[in-house]
Amino acid sequence: MWGAGQMMFNKILVLVSADAGRISDYKTLAQVVFKNLNPATDIYFSQGPMDVLDHSCSKLGFGGKMCIDGTFKFDEEVDESWQLSPGSHRDGSTQLNAAELKRKFEEIAAVNLSLLDKQIPCLIISVQKNRRNHVRELHEMIGALKEMESVKMVLYVEHTVDANDLPVALWRFCNNLDPKRDHFICKTQSKVVANKYSACIGFDGTIKSKEFDNFQRDWPNIIVSDQKTIHAVDEKWNTFEIGAFIPSPSLKFRDQLYGTEAMVE
């Protein structure tokens, strides 16, 4: 599919079985994908052409791609060395505690556990990097926790991003990710099933810098209106006759700015 016209610019591709249900039913679709997914064997990475506006690529217009195989697996497709259905034997939402994770790891700003309650074994964690390989090392420590055996995936976002605002967190995460470069697998001995391994994949969706990531390109700042513009629009709103007042979307993102220039300072 990555060779089919505009699909060559795709960065994240998810495949599901034909009977997975409506692809517009995101909750059910995610449940099916994660039920069928072994992070260690069912995610494929490649590289190729990317949109020139994709700022996360190490090289302009060329970067990593990821295909997640969320289809049903036949017996011959299953690697028996892995725990076959991670997460089915325990309720991760009752095991993991956001406050405890923040206490153990001071670089964590916020933890979103809400997907676990929906039978989607995925966490979103806001983290403030302060060194090279920070997110990789953090993921190895988090993935080794016994409470994490039911979790298949962790998405790391910048500390300025509200991990509990799911649409915004996923938007920022996907923008800042090169899947091939920014993933890491944590393989652990199962503490529940003897002679089996479990896997949790982590993705670094934080901003990339020369200092911490050896990233050589400019990193764009998020775009927001200044206070003067916001105030001017608010004052004129009733004259536009376009309906009830809507606060400026920029207000929500001002805390995610890094400096005042077009590029992150």
Where are each of the predicted segments found?
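Charged, compositionally biased interaction regions
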Residues: 1-265
